[in-house]
Amino acid sequence: MADPHSILKKVFGYDSFRPGQEDIVRRLLAGQDVLAVMPTGAGKSICYQVPALLLPGITIVVSPLVSLMKDQVGALVQAGVAAAFLNNSLTDNQKALMLRRAREGWYKIIYVAPERLEMPGFQRFAQEKLISMVTVDEAHCISQWGQDFRPSYLRIKAFVDSLPNRPVVGAFTATATARVRDDIRSHLELHQPYEVTTGFDRPNLYFETRRALPSQKPKELLDLVLREGDNAGIVYCSTTKQVDETARLLQSRGIRAAAYHAKLDAEVRRKNQDDFLYDRVQIMVATNAFGMGIDKPNVRFVIHYNMPKDLESYYQEAGRAGRDGLPSRCILLYSGTDVRTIRFFIDKEMEADNGLPADVKAEAARKAEERLKYMTFYSTTQKCLRRFMLNYFGEAAPEKCGNCSCCLFAEQNAQEVEQRAAAAKQRAAANSRRLSSRRAAVGGDLSEADEKLLAALYALRKRLAAKQNVPAYMVFSDATLREMVQSKPLSMDEFLNITGVGEKKAARYGMAFLRAIEDMVGSRE
């Protein structure tokens, strides 16, 4: 029987687990429930995907968004894993075909929305087959204290209880205060769970806050975006009107930008999201409707044009940057108007006729006001931003991180901050190197010759992705390409030693990359 390490290497192409991952994998394999709080980019999915391939039956992954399911399943299929998703983006015929194949044993991992668990057809399927594990992704959605509460998550427990044999349950989230963790534990009725918080810190992320009047924000944004060159980024706005105006502003300056919000036609949203994932668009301007579950690893900056409603939302949205571990920037543009806008939405929620009792709505408003208070403190503090954020999530931190605007430039204005941004990126790269010797190879500067090789590998990846009709990062991540440049593998064995190269991907893409590397290396000798 295969062991977790062999699955990790053969399927996903990693030599070793990240901190916290192996313990979670082994607990799930032993049948112990798990509650794991791991920051975006820490590798939550590996924690349930590896045991899913080792357990005898099927793993059901409960996921809140169609985009997350599509992204995760696409990456698994590229790695050679039998995975599928079942949601309303499929036609009735496609759903019927997927369920028939699931009954026939085609799949090891199936992603579904929580609402799907209540549907008779899916319940019959789950009764017939061995469900070995139920994974609850974005588990904070089960808590009224969480920033993304979804009542449908409260019905996951009933589904688990209805199965002939209780599966092991794993609950995963990137952001959860102690109150939210209590809710997850109780609402899912986890059985003596193994609880782990791997730490919220993302050393490769540089955090910055800027106070700017609404009239100043367009210029601030343009300056920030233009300094990023061709880097992929996300700009978050608080209203759909602001999203549309900001996208038009960027487009008017020749920047490849697209908009994403709930008022756009579903087909337009899908196209714009795909354009961003496939690198046809450089910048996505969006409300918080965009991002949860988006697994694009090479987002180099996230700018919040408006202050979010709480630190949970901010940390999750900012965490879309730098998922590949390379230095990235998270910048918040703050004005007092942002607070008034958020209070307007809180009051609107109170007045909504949503069937909730008045006392429940009042309590929800009180919780929202409390979270807003801490978000405002973060936006205006002159102390270390990273420390403030980590302390909010219950984690100790040094007094100064050396990689946020308050630590580096407390006495300087925004123009001076920009002049020293390169130094901040260097510090982030140094922090990333301390995390992992393997990452050391991917974070540093490259020689001119290696830059040409990297450009050739990027171009090759783009062509291969187009043939497969998948986003480029699903072929190989930026970090994997950088390691290829550093290591310059010239044989399949050497290629398989590159982080992120599993056996299926090596078989599919290996010879093309080896030829490209050999052509460039040979031309210099």
Task: Give the ranges of each region predicted by the language model.
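Helicase motor core with emphasis on the C-terminal RecA-like subdomain
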Residues: 2-11, 15-19, 23-45, 52-55, ...
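Short alpha-helical "packing" element that flanks the helix-turn-helix/winged-helix DNA-binding module
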Residues: 21-24, 375, 481
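Conserved catalytic helix of short-chain dehydrogenase/reductases
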Residues: 67
